[in-house]
Amino acid sequence: MAKEDEEPGAHRGGSTCSRPQPGKGGRTAACCSRPKVAALIVGTLLFLTGIGAASWAIVTILLQSDQEPLYQVQLSPGDSRLAVFDKTEGTWRLLCSSRSNARVAGLGCEEMGFLRALAHSELDVRTAGANGTSGFFCVDEGGLPLAQRLLDVISVCDCPRGRFLTATCQDCGRRKLPVDRIVGGQDSSLGRWPWQVSLRYDGTHLCGGSLLSGDWVLTAAHCFPERNRVLSRWRVFAGAVARTSPHAVQLGVQAVIYHGGYLPFRDPTIDENSNDIALVHLSSSLPLTEYIQPVCLPAAGQALVDGKVCTVTGWGNTQFYGQQAMVLQEARVPIISNEVCNSPDFYGNQIKPKMFCAGYPEGGIDACQGDSGGPFVCEDSISGTSRWRLCGIVSWGTGCALARKPGVYTKVTDFREWIFKAIKTHSEASGMVTQP
């Protein structure tokens, strides 16, 4: 994490794991949307209709809000019933139980930004109650293998048996400890960013990363050049904010799955940094504690919001020519539109569609060397409760904290399907693996 630099011509290169410089020449939920409902409405609904029905009525009001809608797939906070919003009727429908419940539960969890479904079951609406929902959707089981969203494979039906699907998704994006608020560019504290990990090669911190689960880490592809591909020399450190903390949990690396479209790995002379994304599969699973927790992915179709202030964290250099931070740093920076970031005063058309910029036009606070691969997270409540989502991966930039040269990030929402496919396809792989 860097303060403003003294070298206006400097680039984010470095001898360890620098961010490479580029070459020269139907309504979606938004990252960090925050639904707001008056306490009077909530209290009235709870009193008049009961908690179950009120919860869905409240969610319906939020989803229909013109400003900050909830996501159209939700889990009931009471009994984990999976429900989908019917925009035509303006109501929630349950998913009729089928032989494909496991796959449907997995698709629903993934669509909401959870990594996977941990369990599923079914309930009878006649005994469990409708709880504010109205009717059913049935699943076209033949379309499931290619479906990316539940809406791709569901239609209104009668569901004669009256049995509906429930699901338990892997929890994510929530702190387990109460924390104080810190405003950018300062030391962090234990438990604030429990998904942040340190990737170290021969004991040296080279990159950051984000826990998606106890055994999968998302980071940047450029952290693994040819010189750093002996996986037995990599270690992943989690559960600490001080780089020398004796309390950190460390594990080895079984496999690295990197994007086959990351061009510098094909030809080192290429300076085009699209697809700068990689998954690290750990040799075993980390214990999840109040200091070690996974982050959520963006929900399917979730868009970035220009101007939204989110948080980047890392142990990178505090200045371009400075030393790496000994304590995890955090900074709140706003998302900059690609139109602005591609203007001649900024990066002049070097920002590709699957990238985005974040920072202040005047500079002053930014990610830097050693922050590469680390998380850019945004908080929202589109899943009914406040969660942090991994919206970006620290990728590249010119200098550190320079005016009109903000940090550039891999746009995670554009790689959701790549992530899910890589995890399912390469869970038993070892070594360096390419995923198209």
From Swiss-Prot:
Cytoplasmic topological intervals: 1-38
Cysteines engaged in disulfide bonds, as pairs: C96-C159, C109-C169, C138-C157, C172-C296, C207-C223, C310-C378, C341-C357, C368-C400
Entry membrane topology: Single-pass type II membrane protein
Broad EC category: hydrolase
Classification lineage: Eukaryota, Metazoa, Chordata, Craniata, Vertebrata
Domain annotation SRCR: ranges: 73-170
Residue spans, topological domain Extracellular: 60-436
E.C. number(s) listed in UniProt: 3.4.21.106
GO cellular component: apical plasma membrane; cell surface; cell-cell junction; cytoplasm; endoplasmic reticulum membrane; extracellular region; neuronal cell body; plasma membrane
The encoding gene: Hpn
Tissue-specificity statement: Detected in kidney, in thick ascending tubule epithelial cells (at protein level). Detected in kidney and liver.
Annotated consequence of substituting S372A: Abolishes catalytic activity
GO molecular function: serine-type endopeptidase activity; serine-type exopeptidase activity; serine-type peptidase activity
Biological process terms in GO annotation: basement membrane disassembly; cholesterol homeostasis; cochlea morphogenesis; detection of mechanical stimulus involved in sensory perception of sound; epithelium development; negative regulation of apoptotic process; negative regulation of epithelial cell proliferation; negative regulation of epithelial to mesenchymal transition
Parts of the chain that traverse the membrane: 39-59
Organism of derivation: Mus musculus
Stretches assigned to the Peptidase S1 domain: 182-424
Keywords, alphabetical: Cell membrane, Disulfide bond, Glycoprotein, Hydrolase, Membrane, Protease, Secreted, Serine protease, Signal-anchor, Transmembrane, Transmembrane helix
Residues annotated as glycosylated: N131
UniProt catalytic activity: Cleavage after basic amino-acid residues, with Arg strongly preferred to Lys
Protein name: Serine protease hepsin
Catalytic-site annotation from UniProt: H222 (charge relay system), D276 (charge relay system), S372 (charge relay system)
